[in-house]
Regions:
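Basic, flexible Lys/Arg- and Gly-enriched helix-loop patches that mediate nucleic-acid binding at interfaces
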Residues: 1-235
Length: 235
């Protein structure tokens, strides 16, 4: 495997950054400083140190993104920009997909991976992965309406939602909603069942992952080893 490709696989940098760091002498392979980033390394046996830290090959790529408004949760779209379009070409690995969906105008935490097995396990209905959203609504949500939320609501098509958590803040027109399912436009439709309307929606957690507060809208980072292990355990 090429050294720059190996470095990208570890989640430490993009390919362009890898090339710069190799040229700067910030990378060693088995104690030797390589001249170029296109030389081959053995991903299973060689010891690679990047900027003073030993890095290990990852078979799969895992990315946390702070999804901005107006971007769709899809691998490709003929009309709108997708979450994959926000990644550099060398980071968009074959088979990468958004794990779960956020509506076009919903913001926040999006998990992207090329690990199809893990993704499908996390998205399986029986997994009941908890998702927390920060919301604002047009009208205040009353305590009685909050109880209806927590007991499950009947949507306009007759679907009975699973019990959902809701924590109200301020005047009751904002707070946090917790779901264990992910039906199409679910929170929007649940508020509409209360004759209310969502004016702002942002996902702040997905299972064991919490949105990194340092990520600006449209920014992304690789998951840490600890976050990957937590996802595996959760699935």
């Amino acid at each position: 495997m090429r050294l720059d490709k190996f470095l990208v696989s570890t989640g430490c940098c993009t390919r362009s950054v890898a090339k710069k760091q190799v040229r700067a002498g910030a990378v060693t392979v088995n104690g030797r400083t390589p001249r170029t980033s296109d030389e081959n390394v053995d991903e299973n046996n060689d010891t690679v140190v990047y900027c003073g830290k030993t890095v290990v090959y990852r078979k799969y790529t895992y990315i946390m993104m702070n999804k901005p408004e107006g971007v769709v949760s899809a691998t490709e779209d003929g009309r709108d920009k997708t979450v994959l379009d926000l990644l550099p070409p060398d980071v968009r690995t074959k088979g990468m997909f958004p794990c779960g969906r956020l509506d076009k105008n919903t913001l926040g935490l999006m998990l992207l991976t090329d690990n199809g097995d893990l993704g499908h396990r996390l998205l399986a209905p029986k997994s009941h992965v908890t998702k927390i959203y920060r919301f604002r609504s047009k009208f205040p949500v009353s305590e009685e309406e909050a109880k209806r939320f927590e007991n499950g609501l009947t949507l306009e098509d007759g679907y009975e939602t699973k019990p959902a958590g809701i924590r109200l803040e301020g005047d009751g027109n904002q707070g946090y909603i917790t779901l264990v399912e992910g039906k199409y436009h679910q929170i929007k439709r649940m508020l509409e069942a209360l004759d209310n309307k969502i004016t702002y929606l942002e996902r702040v957690s997905f299972g064991p992952l919490t949105l990194d507060g340092e990520l600006e809208r449209g920014e992304w980072r690789y998951l840490t080893d600890e976050e990957i292990a937590a996802l595996e355990a959760h699935a």
